[in-house]
Amino acid sequence: MSNKVLSCLISLFLLGAGVAKAQMGDQTSIGPRIGVNFSNVSNIEGSKSLTGLVLGLTSTYSITEATGLTVDLLYSQEGYSLNDVDLRLNYLQLPIYFDLFFGELGDKFRPKVYAGIVPGILLSAKNGDAKVDNDFFNTVNFAVSGGLGFNLRMSSRVWLNTDLRAYLGLNDIRDKSLQDGDKNANSTIQLSVGVAYGLSKI
């Protein structure tokens, strides 16, 4: 199942990017994103925040001068620390956001706020240095997310993007057979930077 979901997420991102380039190039940008996660899991007494890596691709389509749609494809390390042991959950995520931009279209500096959903699948899990069987965890993870940031124009078609995001998991990270009433859901604060390149129509 996880392989099918993984293929679906990647295909959706690539299909969207291809359609954007072919039909909406003048309003579309795409590029790399990298950052850091500060994550934890709810209802685990004594758990502490875990620092992890996030990296991947980001794309934005400008619907109007003030609104847009952002779709990312990200490798995201989440989890928590308990008794000096880190439980790390590595996900492939497809964040989808509706963006609201401030200022004018041609401005060099444009603040933004956004909100959306984050479907993802579990790629692997580690408890300390030991790999943990994925069967102990929920393969599919959903979250709601919001954030703020700014886009800084570096040239006519290149932008530096800085983002601060919050993720709130909607489902238990554990497999259904291990759930006992109190939901253990991911919660993450993410700080990232990216470079977006404007596409031209074919």
Question: What residues fall within each predicted segment?
Answer:
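Residues that define the transmembrane beta-barrel architecture of outer-membrane proteins
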Residues: 26-30, 49-53, 88-94, 109, ...
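Short glycine/proline- and aromatic-enriched beta-strand/turn motifs that initiate or cap beta-hairpins
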Residues: 21-61, 196-202
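Cleavable N-terminal export/targeting peptides
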Residues: 1-26, 200-202
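Transmembrane beta-barrel strands of outer-membrane/channel proteins
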Residues: 32-38, 71-75, 98, 113-121, ...
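Gram-negative (and chloroplast) outer-membrane scaffold detector with strong preference
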Residues: 24, 28, 61-129, 202
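Outer-membrane beta-barrel translocator domains and adjoining extracellular loop/strand segments
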Residues: 42-48, 81-86, 124-132, 173-179
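Outer-membrane beta-barrel "beta-signal"
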Residues: 33, 95-99, 185-202
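Outer-membrane beta-barrel proteins
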Residues: 18, 40, 63-65, 98-104, ...
